[in-house]
């Protein structure tokens, strides 16, 4: 499914799940001798659910609002530092190979571009884990292609069919459980890349993993 129906369905399911948790807490507390460990477990689930709803709502807001980027000469080393700092906070034990020409310079808004790469790295690592390949690294590398600097994020996940590749950049599309993923990540990434006068492409085959390529115009300093 695609479109706003997924968004509405996801919120509804989460709120219904929260209602069930609230009912369980209330029923347990009404007992003469409530099991506080069960209450704490339900409270923890409720907190996690609410945090997820807040996080996804913020993600949707960031994607929906107009992007106002400030492009300045930025090295890949600077982008790498910001991106990996955020990624390591979420997945400190993830296996990652990083091969960037750190002195290469592009015109970029460092915060937004790092956010896009963070999304791609997060997707890549989760694809590895979902495929049972948590013992294999994901890769972030750079190269040159004519007038562009190319950033590649590569995973060893299950890969995608051609049909899936045609849908992944649509807003609200997701191959994951719609209750936990609202399918804004890649749409958000492409929005950021386009704001950098760049492009985003994907190469993938079922069972062979996936590569995402971010193409950004090379920065050439005026002489």
PLM regions and their residue ranges:
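Acidic ATP/Mg2+-coordinating residue in the GHKL
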Residues: 155
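Conserved catalytic submotifs in the C-terminal HATPase_c
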Residues: 95-105
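Conserved HAMP-HisKA connector
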Residues: 1-10
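Short alpha-helical Gxxx[C/S/T] motif in the catalytic ATP-binding
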Residues: 185-189
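Short conserved segment of the HATPase_c
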Residues: 160-172
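Conserved DHp (HisKA) dimerization/phosphotransfer helix of two-component histidine kinases, i.e.
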Residues: 17-93
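Detector for a conserved hydrophobic position within an alpha-helical segment of the HATPase_c
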Residues: 193-194
């Amino acid at each position: 499914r695609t479109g706003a129906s997924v968004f509405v369905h996801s919120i509804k399911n989460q709120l219904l799940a929260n209602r069930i948790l609230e009912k369980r807490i209330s029923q347990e507390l009404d007992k003469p001798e409530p099991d506080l460990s069960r209450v704490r477990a339900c409270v923890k689930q409720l907190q996690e659910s609410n945090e997820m709803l807040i996080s996804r709502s913020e993600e949707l807001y960031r994607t929906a609002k107009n992007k106002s980027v400030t492009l300045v000469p930025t090295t890949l080393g600077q982008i790498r530092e910001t991106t990996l700092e955020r990624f390591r906070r979420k997945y400190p034990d993830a296996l990652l190979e990083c091969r960037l020409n750190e002195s290469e310079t592009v015109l970029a808004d460092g915060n937004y571009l790092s956010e896009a790469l963070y999304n791609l790295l997060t997707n890549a690592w989760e694809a590895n884990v979902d495929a049972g390949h948590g013992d294999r690294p994901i890769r972030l590398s750079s190269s040159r292609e004519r007038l562009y600097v190319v950033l590649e994020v590569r995973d060893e996940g299950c890969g995608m069919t051609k049909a899936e590749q045609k849908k992944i950049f649509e807003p609200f599309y997701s191959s994951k459980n719609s209750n936990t993923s609202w399918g804004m990540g890649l749409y958000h990434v492409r929005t950021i890349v386009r704001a950098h006068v760049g492009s985003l492409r994907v190469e993938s085959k079922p069972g062979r993993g996936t590569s995402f390529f971010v193409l950004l115009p090379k920065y050439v300093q005026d002489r």
